[in-house]
From Swiss-Prot:
Cofactor binding note: Binds 1 Fe(2+) ion per subunit.
Designated gene of the protein: tsaD
Source organism of the structure: Pseudomonas putida (strain ATCC 47054 / DSM 6125 / CFBP 8728 / NCIMB 11950 / KT2440)
Lineage top rank: taxon: Bacteria
NCBIfam families reported in the protein's UniProt record: gcp_kae1, T6A_TsaD_YgjD
Family stated for the protein in its record: Belongs to the KAE1 / TsaD family.
Stated name of the protein: tRNA N6-adenosine threonylcarbamoyltransferase
Reaction catalysed by this enzyme: L-threonylcarbamoyladenylate + adenosine(37) in tRNA = N(6)-L-threonylcarbamoyladenosine(37) in tRNA + AMP + H(+)
Cofactor: Fe(2+)
Entry GO CC: cytoplasm
InterPro entries, per database record: ATPase_NBD (IPR043129), Gcp-like_dom (IPR000905), KAE1/TsaD (IPR017861), TsaD (IPR022450)
Keywords (A to Z) from UniProt: Acyltransferase, Cytoplasm, Iron, Metal-binding, Transferase, tRNA processing
GO biological process: tRNA threonylcarbamoyladenosine modification
Amino acid sequence: MLVLGLETSCDETGVALYDSERGLLADALFSQIDLHRVFGGVVPELASRDHVKRMLPLIRQVLDEAGCVATEIDAIAYTAGPGLVGALLVGASCAQALAFAWDIPAIGVHHMEGHLLAPMLEENPPEFPFVALLVSGGHTQLVRVDGIGQYELLGESLDDAAGEAFDKTAKLIGLNYPGGPEIARLAEQGVPGRFVFPRPMTDRPGLEFSFSGLKTFALNTWQQCKNAGDDSEQTRCDLSLAFQQAVVETLTIKCKRALKQTGLKRLVIAGGVSANKALRASLEDMLGSIKGNVYYARPQFCTDNGAMIAYAGCQRLLAGQQQDLAISVQARWPMEQLPPL
């Protein structure tokens, strides 16, 4: 089955072609970072308009790269949520229109299920069951995964997601959008130990997260430095390192608890923050200490992309899942509501 995947949940337009027998044939992405940077964050209306502009050229691009024609496509998968409603509607409308014109099925895919399954595109994919850490700008969740659609939420953030905390903290100390990569870059030059941040909710049982306090701690620390006349680049580096260490150690502690609670030794990390090198290194060390394994997608598939949507949609279509031509998207969509395969 040859599936065209469309991703438009936020500020990246992703298109890919995935074949159930040959694997990923082509993948293209247009990022709107430059468009939104001047505003310090994503402007939903601008995101939607840019998706409209980029979608059809990217579809033509992946068809050319794969050496395919439209008549060879068996189905279309598109992101139906969660995300920005206007942006989601661009992908959904395009998918359903093409599906109607080409007389093929279209299926809406859960954005975070796409992220969760992205490591399945790698040469050494994880086997079920496993624990997944979904960590992005909008989500921080620990999930037990027994199969596609078989999800048990173990814990999640009570306030800011980890990626959101990265971006907000970066903005507070004067870094460019998107803030996560900027903090990671500066952290490489930071002096360990100059600042010590708390590890929120690690001193009590449970698998919930809270990152809003770290953002406040960073702001107060930065203001103290500025009041003392020290708002140098090195101070930004030191603060970035301390903040990143706090987030990474908190995530690692909770992942270790989740593995112990479930009795599993396979961990998948997915979502934009899973590209963070410090987080990967910390989780690899932790899994090594318990003789377990950690899995993640290549960096280009950690952020939003069409390949993960094409793959997830293909699995559900092969299992016989069907959908009518109604255009329906959801800004919020608990993953536990998905039907199991």
